[in-house]
Amino acid sequence: MLRRLLIHTILFLFGLSLGAGLPWVWWLDREAERRFAERQWTQDSRIYARPLELYAGLELRLEALVVELERIGMRAGDPSRVGRFSQQGPRINLHAPAFRFPDQDQGAQRLRVTIRNGVVEALERSDGESLALIRLPAAELGDLLPAGSDDRTLTRLGDFPPLLVTGIQAVEDRQFRHHHGVDPRGLARAVWTNLRRGALVQGGSTITQQLVKNLFLTPDRSLIRKLNEAVMSISLERHFSKGEILEAYLNEVYLGQDGAQAIHGFGRASEHYFGLPVQALDVDQIALLIGMVRGASWYHPVRNPERALKRRDFVLGQFLNTGLIDAGQHDRLIARALDVATHRQRRQRPNAAFLELVARQLRRDYRDEDLRGTGLRVFTTLSPSAQLAAERGLARGLAERERQPNELQGAAILVEPSSGEIRALVGDRTASRRGFNRALDARRSVGSVIKPFVYLLALAQPDRYTLVSPITDGPIDVELPGQALWQPRNHDDISHGEVALMDALANSYNQATVALGLEVGLPALYRLLGQLGIEPGSEQHPSALLGAISLTPLQVAQLYQPLAAEGYSAPLRAITQVVDVDNREIGRYPMRLRPIREEGALALLDFALRQTVLDGTARRLPGLLDQDPGVRGKTGTTNDRRDAWFVGYTRQWLGVVWTGRDDNAPAGVTGSATALPIWAEIFRPLSHRPQPAQWPNALEWFWIDWPQARLASEDCQNALAVPFIQGSQPLELSDCFEPASTSRRSRGRRR
Amino acid sequence: MNRTHLAFSKTGLALATLVMISACATQPPAPTEDRSVAEQVRAPAAEQTRGLQVYPLRNPAVTELSQAALAAEQAGDLDQAALLLERALRIQPRDPELLQHMAEIRLERGEWDQAENFAARSFDVGPRVGQICQRNWRTVALARERLQRYDEAANARERLQECQVEPPVRL
């Protein structure tokens, strides 16, 4: 009777579990298959600097190359290892990691670069073969709209180093190739241990089980969850190949945190901890990461280096036991110190202002959901070494020149004029700070920075104006309908009387500029600014002639770009190309040109802005540079010294510096005493080639008895060689003019 | 000539009100791959090698890139050709040959205004005589014709004639 009851109970329970369990198992099986097949991994969209192109003849300082190498994740060390470089005198031996360019998969390569006197002298492969051109990998600047809590760099199974693929099995799951999702022997061992200890302390999880747990299940340790895990693991193995499972595992496994983001997979972990693509990892680095699978935080190489080292050596021991490495290798490797890139704090990295510019532009052209977590790669125009120079120059320059600590703020922009590519952008004296981006958003009075455009308008009328035309710098009353009389004054409160046009610009005389500006007309100035891509507003007040117009530093850079590019306007751009996760191009921002058809007038203005540096308001500049490669420039100071500007350019670099106070209070700054030295500080570490000015054929040069509008001889005391648009030179002769000598010459200056 | 106002190019872009970075959005694909257009520019000039020719010195890196650009162009990959030429122009921004090649790529892509502007830039920095000068003005003329600015196109054809300069007599 009792026995029958027992049998009936057992049968009943069996039937119940069969009835309830089978549908459960069926459902789990279906779920596991569906969810694995449909899984979509997010991968942050990443932003890259412009790749540095190396070639013989490139102007590049050794220190700048080192900065560039460090920004692509390379470190000083033995260049037989990928990602390392060493320096011997003028030569740098480097082992550049592989990089996937939009148009080319480039493998790792060993190179020798010789730099002498700031110029790349030779570029060779390590076997001595000379190379014409090498494109270094592009530095990663940061993520675009981080996709939330996870980040990974998806990597195909075949792209992982073979040692990583076999090593992970040796350590985590030796039976992986043979089991069907669960490993009964491993499970039995775990169960036995757990029973003996009276608690769940050991998991005999296979790689498949770990994957199932990470992908589908909560991390609690209950028996039900363990059962679900086993069923789903067997299910995965039924429906998918070992390769697919392993690939998913290697991309999913949790390997620590990067700020608020979890690092998933060996691809991203390799970039995070070593600054290298996973293919470039050495054996000890692979062992360290494999060791972290057991507990990414417990074995964290930076926070818990001793534990991490022990764990790495344990993993190396497993490699030795399974024959993956030999004893000699093992002994050599365990002698190595941990080798993580602790400086690699991506979230705190600078470039915040530039990244914001990139993000704004992308948001304008794409929808947020197309950008977020889709693994796009955005290639930009930023030069890491120029960016560093701009950040440092601004921070140091402000600290040296402010009345009290942290009073001033500033912005700096560097542009390559001929292409309009933005090489550096700083929007805060603390470059890593996110927030108010002054380079893009601070609309400030530009002051005298506007004046060259007034003079350009005048010089475009060669029958009326030349560089030596006399204009009057004197008290001037401007009547405005319904408003008080406007009486502009000079900075020094002195009227200088009749002055040559070029001197009025070079010395930034206000009254002369207003007189000239009223002649050429205010509407013409607004039209010109509009044609150069700037909308200064519709209300036209003559004080605009003195720069009572509020513009952002980026707008000022756009205004000056065609002056620095021989009259070809190119829209400033920060992005060159956008590719998707499969390297297909989805966006391109090509170089565009638009001619400003006043070649002659632009060249005259260029000459006058050079004169501003040699003998005008910017005359301090040459003394602040080791070598003056022919900088043209203009200072700007606004009322009560609220804003200080300096814009300077060569054919290679256009730089804009603004400083002032955020609350727009008087800041005690001037263009020549504050902004100019900061500009020099930024410019000094940049590489540049001195380029002889190339003047358009439409110009003719004459000796002028400066500042009189009279032709002179070369040996006259005040003789200055001045360019004129053909036929516009003065006809009057100076007293010292000697008919025997020719007054015309090609180029030169004497004063 | 009475010039009371700056004659700035009106053909240019009306740059966005968002002037922070007046970048151009993604390039629309060329309406047609007008390969023959570029050929019209190059071939006639190549036949006339009699006049004075000026060949600028070339950086080997630029040579490598411009040859790759030519190969990409011949393979029909105009996007890649343009990218390679941009890389070369970063190295030598004032190279008239590179600028003219870019103008021809833009011509093939049907970007008439950019073709004209790159050719004009090439002429400005170039020798202003010989083959490249002829290619400059031929490109400008073709682009203007496509833009239906026929008078200006005729003007460009006249300038084309001035490219032919007899070489200096050698002793």
Residues of each region from the PLM?
Chain B
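Bacterial Sec signal peptide processing site at the extreme N-terminus
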Residues: 18-45, 171
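Alpha-helical segment of the N-proximal tetratricopeptide repeat
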Residues: 55-83
